[in-house]
Amino acid sequence: MGEKTVEKSFLYLLPEKHTAEELAQVLTDAGFDKKKVEIWKEINLLELTLNGSVYVEDFEESLRKEDEDTLSGLGMQQVYSVTYPAEEAKSVKEIMQKWMASFDGKLGSDTEDFAPFLTIEEL
């Protein structure tokens, strides 16, 4: 039997609203293969095909009023859930470095207050 892939995830909190298309553009501008990028505009989801798939999904539908208040207090306006196979951690770190350089933001946990916050190296 094949080994089960270990999935990892975190939340990417942004200080301004950006679409999945804008996130993808930063990567393709940096040389990421456009054939490995798929965008579902209607649900604001980005799939990056590496050895496994990295999903970057708008988390807005999952936010409660309290979450929105917490985000506002942190100076953040948008949240994406990022899910990826553990073996893609190096690639995800590189992707996050590009996005953080372009959009800033924080890397959070799926908890009530989004803490603990993570560094790119901890992914």
In which residue ranges do the predicted regions lie?
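Acidic, proline/glycine-rich low-complexity IDRs
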Residues: 1-9, 14, 18-35, 83, ...
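Short, intrinsically disordered low-complexity segments
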Residues: 16-87
